[in-house]
From Swiss-Prot:
It holds the Pfam family Sod_Cu. This is Superoxide dismutase [Cu-Zn] 2. Disulfide bonds join 55-144. It comes from the Eukaryota. Belongs to the Cu-Zn superoxide dismutase family. GO terms for cellular component: cytoplasm. One of its GO terms (biological process) is removal of superoxide radicals. Its cofactor is Cu cation; Zn(2+). It comes from Zea mays. Cu cation binds at residues 44, 46, 61, 118.
Amino acid sequence: MVKAVAVLAGTDVKGTIFFSQEGDGPTTVTGSISGLKPGLHGFHVHALGDTTNGCMSTGPHFNPVGKEHGAPEDEDRHAGDLGNVTAGEDGVVNVNITDSQIPLAGPHSIIGRAVVVHADPDDLGKGGHELSKSTGNAGGRVACGIIGLQG
């Protein structure tokens, strides 16, 4: 079992996200995020583990095979497209995602990359906005953290 963790930090938003993968199976993503406005928020793995300029320096969505942005269940999607997480009235998200395109080992490993939560909902590439096919038009990056190996 490979395990990883990302501590999310933003101006008002914070959280801890855990990743685990057994063998070649899917990766399970769990944890919680607080300080969000109620509703949907885009949630993605970004290509770079660089936070020197805050969340802006984490680069685009992790996309090792050059696809367009989409929903987690779409065949045509960035590997890092994890869809939306939902914050309750208290601004808290409890994350529980299982995904097969974000491995913790191998050539497309997400270790050392960043996980980012966005201000707005991800339209899953279906919104018709000029940014729909690249970012899901999910708005600003309100918190991010670098995915690191865990013992």
